[in-house]
Amino acid sequence: MYPPKASGDPAAGAAPVTGFPVGGPAASSQWSSGLLDCFDDCGLCCLTCWCPCITFGRVAEIVDRGATSCGTAGALYAVLAYFTGCQWIYSCTYRAKMRAQLGLPETPCCDCLVHFCCEPCALCQQYKELKARGFDPVLGWDRNATMLPPSAQGMGR
């Protein structure tokens, strides 16, 4: 009903910010889950094992900040998987991009080897990392992007 009292700190009422840092590279941090923690989320694990193109598409859309849609990335992943079996090369580039954006270490080994040896585990780990950072990959980039609240409007006739 009443506006909050002003304090000396201009950031006192600011909402916490999640997602990708703006500007330079992120400070170094750790993965929120291990590579083999894919079985912690049974639904995600099943989706990724049976339809990895969906999990990959969702991750790619968030990592590309909406420049690539989930459908486009997922379809390209599926075509590469079906015709060449080398979809892991495509998906490892997104792991590298995500690590650079979030300041994550290249563990347990190089990105391409992680995706070559255990593609479903790598995709689950990336998906779970985005969720831990405040994104909901199901919603896509547009619905995850921060929007300003509507301005207060006066009474109209």
UniProtKB/Swiss-Prot annotation:
What keywords tag this UniProt record?
Membrane, Transmembrane, Transmembrane helix
Query: Looking at the keywords, is Transmembrane helix present?
Result: yes
Q: What is its main location?
A: membrane
Please give, as recorded in its UniProt entry, the membrane topology of this protein: Multi-pass membrane protein
| Tissue/organ expression | Expressed in roots, leaves, stalks, immature ears and silks.
Q: Report TM segments.
A: 41-57, 66-83
Entries under InterPro entries matching the protein: PLAC_motif_containing
Instruction: List GO terms (cellular component aspect).
Output: membrane
Q: Which Pfam families match?
A: PLAC8
Localization, per the record, is: Membrane
Family statement drawn from the similarity comment of this UniProt entry: Belongs to the cornifelin family.
Know the name of this protein? Cell number regulator 10
The taxonomy runs: Eukaryota, Viridiplantae, Streptophyta, Embryophyta, Tracheophyta
